[in-house]
């Protein structure tokens, strides 16, 4: 019988990777939680940490690039609201003769996928294409809790309802985080899916990861769990 053949749990705070003062190419990524910020730093990225429901400034992106003396930069906004800011920063940096590309990423799971394939030894253009492909190949979803009554694409929700989203659209309404998470993964998965990534809060329901692992036992799909610590989202989901 099939079963998940790799379950990797990434701890929250372990160590911060120190980047050299001057590097040729830098990856700058936005992060909304301490866990994903640490993971990105350990992967070699310069992280722009943003407050809950906040977005970075143009200066944040520019400073992240110029502080390490890089002449090439890849910017990962990690959400739709930060994308225009990243594009504005890219224009500013180009005026300073820095080669810049904004790699499309609308969720932290797309950013993680892009960073995982970054290759500083490849050409700039090849690196951009590879990272963009990894990002676009990652469907993103999540589970959150309704803060007000509203009419959604999945029906009416009440305060406290658990909402499941896929690619930014509400597709599930329920009462239990784990159950809604499982249904969202079902919607996101296909016969070609290879990896499910869960980015969780610090107080993630203890049954969530075991339940998802059991849920995936019928297919040879990898499961990676990142203790992200992000606000407002009990779990963010990526499927590649």
In which residue ranges do the predicted regions lie?
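N-terminal loops that bind phosphate or other acidic moieties
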Residues: 1-240
């Amino acid at each position: 019988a099939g079963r998940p053949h790799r379950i990797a749990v990434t701890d929250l705070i372990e160590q911060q990777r120190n980047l050299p003062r001057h590097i040729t190419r830098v990856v700058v990524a936005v992060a909304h939680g301490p866990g994903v910020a640490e993971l990105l730093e350990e992967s070699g990225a310069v992280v722009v940490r943003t407050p809950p429901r906040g977005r970075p400034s143009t200066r944040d992106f520019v400073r992240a690039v110029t502080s390490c003396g890089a002449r090439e930069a890849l910017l990962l906004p990690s959400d739709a609201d930060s994308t225009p800011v990243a594009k504005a920063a890219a224009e500013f940096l180009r005026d300073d003769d820095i080669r810049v590309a904004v790699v499309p990423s609308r969720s932290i799971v797309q950013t993680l996928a892009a960073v995982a394939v970054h290759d500083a030894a490849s050409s700039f253009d090849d690196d951009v294409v590879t990272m963009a492909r990894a990002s676009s190949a990652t469907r993103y979803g999540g589970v959150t809790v309704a803060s007000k009554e509203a009419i959604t694409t999945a029906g009416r929700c009440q305060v406290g309802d658990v909402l499941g989203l896929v690619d930014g659209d509400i597709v599930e309404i329920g009462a239990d985080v784990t159950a809604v998470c499982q249904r969202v993964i079902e919607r996101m998965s296909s016969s070609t899916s290879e990896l499910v990534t869960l980015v969780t809060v610090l107080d993630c329901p203890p049954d969530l990861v075991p339940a998802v692992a059991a849920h995936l036992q019928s297919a040879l799909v990898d499961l990676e769990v990142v203790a992200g610590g992000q606000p407002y989202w009990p779990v963010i989901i990526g499927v590649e």
